[in-house]
């Protein structure tokens, strides 16, 4: 083993990815310490709704004991509440569909955690178990997709900047999930068989409806077709997103065929949910979108148009597109072909092959013209 004499703080979540990350770095000779972030205060009144951090902390501590590394424990709940959760609620209240994982990476993991590790703990680097890769060329740092296409997380990291990227390590980005689990089993990590976490980072996925009801005022309203026909009742617009099919409760309506219904828009003023039949119906299709809150990882001149690919949500195949300036701090993204279910509030992330260029927030979609 060779000694790099560099201190790195690993974001330990109690999962297999961060645990293997810590082991790889220690094996390479770094001075490794772990840090467990508590980003959410669990309250007795609603503790059944939340993903408890106690088990994750116990697992993180157990792994650090196995690897003989120190584990810092830090509470970032206030910062999370102010910089992530409040915006999350506001976006839902406005009828949009936010992505809290993008916000969490931007405001917590690659800002608060980064600053605490580099400044307070005097680390040279931070490391996470994200499935992404980093490259350097001519003193510029580039973010690439993870090797495992099914686990690539570059979509969630598009807001990272050069200063932070320079001091980030992503040791499992060149591995597949199967390879990571194989390593965990081989070295007998206590979390080798632990399931991957899913859902919003502060709430279990099965309780999202109850959770939103707890924090946001809402009321039921009409479900209306694009022709203005009332066909049902919704239970609060906050519970629906563009392109949603399941959970509408409007199947088998007399006078309509059996083609599934989809949410095509929300009428906030009249508290109405607008629906139409068929996944590729005219009202759900878009020729492009307008994006704001833009961030480019590397310098990009958007005074001139350029071609790339875009992801309009995490589990989505890249769309060939053209990017042009729209207004100040806004761009127009024109798809090569019409796309379904473009949801305002979601992130749109741009790529050149495996290189993540950056992204922005979908402000509005551009409907297919008649």
UniProtKB/Swiss-Prot annotation:
<keyword id="KW-0808">Transferase</keyword>
<keyword id="KW-0963">Cytoplasm</keyword>
<feature type="binding site">
    <location>
        <position position="129"/>
    </location>
    <ligand>
        <name>ATP</name>
    </ligand>
</feature>
<protein>
    <recommendedName>
        <fullName>tRNA-specific 2-thiouridylase MnmA</fullName>
        <ecNumber>2.8.1.13</ecNumber>
    </recommendedName>
</protein>
<keyword id="KW-0547">Nucleotide-binding</keyword>
<dbReference type="GO" id="GO:0000049">
    <property type="term" value="F:tRNA binding"/>
</dbReference>
<keyword id="KW-0819">tRNA processing</keyword>
<dbReference type="Pfam" id="PF20258">
    <property type="entry name" value="tRNA_Me_trans_C"/>
</dbReference>
<feature type="region of interest" description="Interaction with tRNA">
    <location>
        <begin position="151"/>
        <end position="153"/>
    </location>
</feature>
<feature type="binding site">
    <location>
        <position position="37"/>
    </location>
    <ligand>
        <name>ATP</name>
    </ligand>
</feature>
<dbReference type="InterPro" id="IPR023382">
    <property type="entry name" value="MnmA-like_central_sf"/>
</dbReference>
<comment type="subunit">
    <text>Interacts with TusE.</text>
</comment>
<dbReference type="GO" id="GO:0002143">
    <property type="term" value="P:tRNA wobble position uridine thiolation"/>
</dbReference>
<dbReference type="Pfam" id="PF20259">
    <property type="entry name" value="tRNA_Me_trans_M"/>
</dbReference>
<feature type="active site" description="Cysteine persulfide intermediate">
    <location>
        <position position="201"/>
    </location>
</feature>
<feature type="region of interest" description="Interaction with target base in tRNA">
    <location>
        <begin position="99"/>
        <end position="101"/>
    </location>
</feature>
<feature type="disulfide bond" description="Alternate">
    <location>
        <begin position="104"/>
        <end position="201"/>
    </location>
</feature>
<feature type="region of interest" description="Interaction with tRNA">
    <location>
        <begin position="313"/>
        <end position="314"/>
    </location>
</feature>
<feature type="site" description="Interaction with tRNA">
    <location>
        <position position="130"/>
    </location>
</feature>
<dbReference type="GO" id="GO:0005737">
    <property type="term" value="C:cytoplasm"/>
</dbReference>
<comment type="function">
    <text>Catalyzes the 2-thiolation of uridine at the wobble position (U34) of tRNA(Lys), tRNA(Glu) and tRNA(Gln), leading to the formation of s(2)U34, the first step of tRNA-mnm(5)s(2)U34 synthesis. Sulfur is provided by IscS, via a sulfur-relay system. Binds ATP and its substrate tRNAs.</text>
</comment>
<keyword id="KW-1015">Disulfide bond</keyword>
<dbReference type="GO" id="GO:0005524">
    <property type="term" value="F:ATP binding"/>
</dbReference>
<keyword id="KW-0694">RNA-binding</keyword>
<keyword id="KW-0067">ATP-binding</keyword>
<dbReference type="InterPro" id="IPR014729">
    <property type="entry name" value="Rossmann-like_a/b/a_fold"/>
</dbReference>
<keyword id="KW-0820">tRNA-binding</keyword>
<comment type="similarity">
    <text>Belongs to the MnmA/TRMU family.</text>
</comment>
<feature type="active site" description="Nucleophile">
    <location>
        <position position="104"/>
    </location>
</feature>
<dbReference type="GO" id="GO:0103016">
    <property type="term" value="F:tRNA-uridine 2-sulfurtransferase activity"/>
</dbReference>
<feature type="binding site">
    <location>
        <begin position="11"/>
        <end position="18"/>
    </location>
    <ligand>
        <name>ATP</name>
    </ligand>
</feature>
<dbReference type="InterPro" id="IPR046884">
    <property type="entry name" value="MnmA-like_central"/>
</dbReference>
<dbReference type="InterPro" id="IPR046885">
    <property type="entry name" value="MnmA-like_C"/>
</dbReference>
<feature type="site" description="Interaction with tRNA">
    <location>
        <position position="346"/>
    </location>
</feature>
<dbReference type="Pfam" id="PF03054">
    <property type="entry name" value="tRNA_Me_trans"/>
</dbReference>
<dbReference type="InterPro" id="IPR004506">
    <property type="entry name" value="MnmA-like"/>
</dbReference>
């Amino acid at each position: 083993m060779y000694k790099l004499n560099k201190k790195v703080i690993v974001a330990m979540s109690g999962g297999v990815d961060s645990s293997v990350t810590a082991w790889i770095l220690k094996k390479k000779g770094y001075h490794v310490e772990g840090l467990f972030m508590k980003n959410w205060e669990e309250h007795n009144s609603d503790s059944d709704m939340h993903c408890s951090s106690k088990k994750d902390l116990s697992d993180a501590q157990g792994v650090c004991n196995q690897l003989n590394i120190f584990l810092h424990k830090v509470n970032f709940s206030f910062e999370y509440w102010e910089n992530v959760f409040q915006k999350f609620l506001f976006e839902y209240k406005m009828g949009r569909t936010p992505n809290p994982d993008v916000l969490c990476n931007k405001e917590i993991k690659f800002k608060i955690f980064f600053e605490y590790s580099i400044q307070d703990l005097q680390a040279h680097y931070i490391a996470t178990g994200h499935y992404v890769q980093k490259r350097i060329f001519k003193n510029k740092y580039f973010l690439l997709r993870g090797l495992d296409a099914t686990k690539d997380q570059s979509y969630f990291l598009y807001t990272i900047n050069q200063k932070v990227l320079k001091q980030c390590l992503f040791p499992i980005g060149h591995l597949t999930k199967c390879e990571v689990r194989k390593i965990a089993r081989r070295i007998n990590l206590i979390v080798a068989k632990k399931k991957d976490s899913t859902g919003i980072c502060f709430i279990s996925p099965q309780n999202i409806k109850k959770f939103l009801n707890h924090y946001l005022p809402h009321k039921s309203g009409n479900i209306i077709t694009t022709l203005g026909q009332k066909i049902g009742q919704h239970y609060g617009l906050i519970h629906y997103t563009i392109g949603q099919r399941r959970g509408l409760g409007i199947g088998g309506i007399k006078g309509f065929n059996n083609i599934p219904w989809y949410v095509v828009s929300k009428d906030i003023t009249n508290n109405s949910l607008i629906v139409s039949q068929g996944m590729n119906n005219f009202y759900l299709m878009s020729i492009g979108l307008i994006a704001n809150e833009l961030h480019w990882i590397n310098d990009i001149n958007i005074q001139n148009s350029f071609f790339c690919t875009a992801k309009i949500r995490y589990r989505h195949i890249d769309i060939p597109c053209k990017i042009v300036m729209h207004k100040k701090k806004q761009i127009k993204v024109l798809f090569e072909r019409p796309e379904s279910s473009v949801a305002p509030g979601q992130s749109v992330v741009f790529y050149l092959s495996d290189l993540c260029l950056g992204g922005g927030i979908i402000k509005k979609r551009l409907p297919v013209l008649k």
